[in-house]
From Swiss-Prot:
Pfam families: GatC (PF02686). It comes from Solidesulfovibrio magneticus (strain ATCC 700980 / DSM 13731 / RS-1) (Desulfovibrio magneticus). One of its GO terms (biological process) is regulation of translational fidelity. The gene is gatC. This is Aspartyl/glutamyl-tRNA(Asn/Gln) amidotransferase subunit C. The keyword Ribonucleoprotein does not apply.
Amino acid sequence: MPISSEDAAKVAKLARLRLDDDKLERFAGQMDGILAYMETLGSVDTAGVEPLYSPVTHETPMRADVAAKACSRDQILANAPATDGQFFIVPKIV
């Protein structure tokens, strides 16, 4: 089922994209190509293929969960451009 311009406009709206009509046509064509490729991938026989979650075979060692000495509040706040002594002061955005 080909993707229509209306479908592409709906997806663009959901993604908060503003697209012109000519770009919507191109977007619809690209989405159609992606979905066609997904159908091709879905038709591949993978019955005898073992699932592969990562091509890397090494294991990630776990570190010991022990408390370590952390920086003090004063050391951390020393790097901030503005503080009130206990907290970072940041500019108001809204």
